[in-house]
């Protein structure tokens, strides 16, 4: 479905295994040539990308610390157990360095952002999520699938 709407779509394990190296190459190329055109990279399953591409923690840091300088914006999806409770270096890096997080759960139930004054929040409806920037929380209403 999405393959017709995006410029590059990686949908198989074979393609996934090389995409990390391709992204690093693109960042290096852009840094060298001074290219900074906007490019949104959506990674719906970070756990799969890490396991299939064998990205190291250093490579991941390079991607996130240099990608924004050349116009590359990463939107990462993953299950909560990977980033919220994972003890491996890559989920820990993500946990401490992501700028924005979207939760479809009570803020009190998550373990990696400050819970602040949200200790009494209820379970959000299925069409509500929290957008958290580490400084503020915004409640967003999203559309429901029918």
Where are these regions (language model features)?
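P-loop NTPase catalytic phosphate-binding loop
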Residues: 1-113, 120-122, 141-146
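Short polybasic amphipathic segments
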Residues: 126-132
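C-terminal accessory extensions/subdomains outside the catalytic/core fold
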Residues: 134-139
């Amino acid at each position: 479905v999405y393959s017709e709407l995006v410029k590059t779509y990686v949908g198989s394990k074979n393609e996934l295994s090389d995409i990390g190296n391709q992204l690093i190459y693109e960042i290096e190329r852009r840094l060298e040539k001074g290219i900074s055109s906007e490019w949104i990279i959506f990674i719906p399953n970070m756990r799969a990308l890490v396991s299939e591409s064998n990205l190291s923690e250093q490579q991941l840091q390079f991607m996130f610390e240099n990608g924004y300088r050349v116009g590359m914006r990463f939107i990462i999806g993953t299950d909560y157990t990977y980033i919220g409770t994972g003890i491996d270096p890559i989920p820990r890096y993500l946990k401490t360095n992501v700028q924005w997080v979207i939760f479809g759960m009570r803020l009190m139930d998550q373990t990696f952002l400050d819970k602040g004054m949200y200790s009494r929040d209820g379970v959000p409806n299925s069409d509500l999520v929290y957008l958290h920037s580490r400084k503020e929380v915004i409640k967003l209403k999203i559309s429901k699938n029918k």
